[in-house]
Regions:
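Exported/periplasmic ABC-transporter solute-binding proteins
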Residues: 2-196
Length: 196
């Protein structure tokens, strides 16, 4: 769910004498989950970075009630964790961020925690509300809808990739072609992602 790392490209080059082939097969929006009782409706990327780095610790600092912000996130082996850290937090996560094994667990925690905030794939928001996200103070806030993610208006959207050691041939090419076909992209949508 993340772009290949430079170190992984070097290993690929050393083992197969190639940099491989990157294929974008879907889009995803990393959404911010809030408890339904939380009055906050939108946050900027900078505010989210402040919240998840521990610089912003109270909801009143971002227009909410006077209560401590409780952080939930993905485990550090997750591509979502890495993407969110690199593109939103831009530093280390706050030590009090509770890491959980999957987006469903993050959603479940936020659902039960009035002052919780979590992040994960946009498809998993049952029982919580999405928080609209703004690039900065002067921008429009966008919810992670299909339209906003597909048009790149939603600021925390990413491609999901497949990597191959070489240009696909034979049955592998047929498989890739199917994934990128109308039928394959329909399946992408059915499982909660967005078509490329």
């Amino acid at each position: 769910s993340r772009p290949i790392k430079q170190s992984e490209m070097e290993k690929l080059k050393a083992r197969y004498n190639t940099l491989g082939v990157e294929i974008a097969c879907a889009k995803d929006g990393i959404t911010l989950f809030l408890n339904n009782a939380n009055p906050v409706k939108e946050l900027t990327i900078k505010q989210l970075g402040g919240i998840y780095s521990g610089k912003i610790t109270n909801w009143k600092e971002v227009g909410g009630v006077d209560a401590s912000i409780i952080l939930y996130g993905r485990e550090n082996s997750s591509g979502t964790y890495v993407y969110f850290k690199d593109n939103v937090v831009k530093t280390d996560y706050a030590p009090n961020c509770q890491t959980l094994p999957g987006t469903a667990a993050v959603v479940n925690a936020v659902k039960k925690d009035k002052y919780g905030i979590g992040y994960g794939g946009a498809a998993y928001a049952e029982g919580v509300k999405h928080c609209a996200v703004k690039k900065d103070d002067k921008s429009i806030a966008y919810l992670p809808t299909k339209e906003n993610i597909s048009s790149n208006k939603y600021p925390i959207a990413r491609y999901l990739y497949m990597y191959l050691s070489s240009k696909p041939k034979g049955i592998m090419k047929e498989y890739i072609d199917w994934i990128l076909s109308e039928e394959g992209q329909k399946v992408v949508t059915e499982v909660g992602y967005f078509p490329v």
